[in-house]
């Protein structure tokens, strides 16, 4: 099956050649140079978080920004895998696995929650673009720790106008979301630890 899938992928690339999502270098989903822009370990204090900080794979600029836009708003689903891998590497470097051991005694499940998009954005994209990344991270953490880790589509957006990429800086993005993001009816987060995953840190 893998050989057949590889053959089809090779044929598709011959018929419809692609370029790197970040710089358009031929025959790469993300070339090594652009992929390196997601191999950072950025963090800032976040007092309400269990670890006391948020973490990011890279700065939203240059090739990283271009590739995120190609993936998020122009349907480049082949970026799911390299972005997922970058997220898993970040989780390991940032100490998420060690932090999970710290909450083992106080919660029975860790939920990986993808940040929600507006209904209009999801209709335009035809999918929940963060879900493949959340599933990959959940499987990675479950394999590494043996802990019960699940993906939970816990959040919903209502009444948000415009796109996050059209705002400038975290303050504008935070104002755009304020009062519009809520937990879905019927979802309980009691006795659960939550890892929130987003494409752009807000």
Q: Where are these predicted regions, by residue range?
A:
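Glycine-rich phosphate/pyrophosphate-handling loop used in enzymes and phosphotransfer proteins
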Residues: 1-202
């Amino acid at each position: 099956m893998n050989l057949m899938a590889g053959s089809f992928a090779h044929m598709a690339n011959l018929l419809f050649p692609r370029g790197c999502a970040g710089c358009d270098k031929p025959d790469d989903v993300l070339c090594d140079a652009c992929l390196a822009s997601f191999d950072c370990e950025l963090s800032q204090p976040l007092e309400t978080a269990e670890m006391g900080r948020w973490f990011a794979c890279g700065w939203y600029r240059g090739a990283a920004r271009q590739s995120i836009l190609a993936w998020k708003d122009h349907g480049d689903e082949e970026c799911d895998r390299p972005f997922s891998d970058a997220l898993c590497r970040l989780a390991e470097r940032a100490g998420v696995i060690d932090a999970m051991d710290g909450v083992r005694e106080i919660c029975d499940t860790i939920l990986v929650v993808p940040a929600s998009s507006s209904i209009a954005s999801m209709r335009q994209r035809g999918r929940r673009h963060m879900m493949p990344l959340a599933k990959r991270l959940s499987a990675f953490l479950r394999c590494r720790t043996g802990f019960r880790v699940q993906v939970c589509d816990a959040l919903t957006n209502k009444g948000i106008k415009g796109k996050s990429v059209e705002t400038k800086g975290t303050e504008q993005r935070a104002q755009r979301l304020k009062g519009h993001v809520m937990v879905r009816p019927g979802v309980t987060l009691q006795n659960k630890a939550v890892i929130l995953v987003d494409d752009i840190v807000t």
